Amino acid sequence: MVLLSLALAVPARAAPSSADEEIDGCLACHGQQDLSMTLASGETAPLFMKSELLAGSVHKSLRCTDCHAGLDEVPHPARQYQSLVQFRASFGEACKTCHFDNYTKTLDSLHYALQARGDLFAPTCVKCHGSHGIARPAEPRSRISQTCATCHATISQAYAKSVHGRALIEQNNQDVPVCTDCHRSHDIAGPRNRAWLMSTPNLCGRCHADPQRMKKYGLSTAVLSTYLADFHGVTASFGGQGTRPTERVVALCFDCHGIHDIGKVSGTAAAVFRANLVKTCQKCHRGASANFPAAWLSHYEPSLTRTPLVYLVKLFYTLIIPFIVLGLILQILLHLWRTVTNR
């Protein structure tokens, strides 16, 4: 291992009295574009920092040593790094000092599991949020998807073409979900995590069951309630597990509508368009005939105009069942009265 020194050929200076004074002192060296060091791998690690990045950062009021702890002395004490990847991966350790709650959430995430296995390319705080030019997470929200695209390029391309992605990118529509709305920010679960998979109907329902939001687009808000009431949702409520631990025998939202490539529900190209629906059903129901989808009422409550027969049958049972129950209760009470009077 090669011992790397960050020592700079400048005389020792007195401790700065303010954050601005400390930043100016650090920029005396780190404002030089050619400042760098050579790592054990032979790679060059740049040590230059653009002052304008920090000026527009949410951390602009912090001292440099709030994040770069132990480097308040000049010359700096020696540090050891094997490669540029390891050098960059080490930056995120400073974040937990202030953001401990979010740091503890990452310990349950798929990203941290990759780090724990020694994957130096796994996402860290700095890889997602940046190092010096740190913006507020939601300004603008489209930055979130762009950040995730650094590693998930193929998925990002599919999202950009989806009904959600196009609304965000082309119209700056703030109603649509970005990556973190579905996958969370710090405690990100893997795509095969069973608990997360089975929670996706409620996840989609956070937006699609919102009356104010769906009213803007003329979409039904009964998507979650109708799903939970039909055969797919009932199976999901029991866990939807097959005979093997990894087997799933129930259709969830993304099985029909897509995962990242979610399209409009209207139009002849839609997966849930009546003419295409049989192909969607055949993903699970092999051998399903052309009239198989007719058994599904879509995400709409039965009505006299859309499904009159189903609506009338439901109305009949809604009215008759209370009378049957009341009749049974009356019969029991009469039997009790007869028993008492005959004694």
Where are these regions (language model features)?
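Short sequence/structural segments immediately N-terminal
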Residues: 11-343
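Bacterial N-terminal signal peptides
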Residues: 1-9
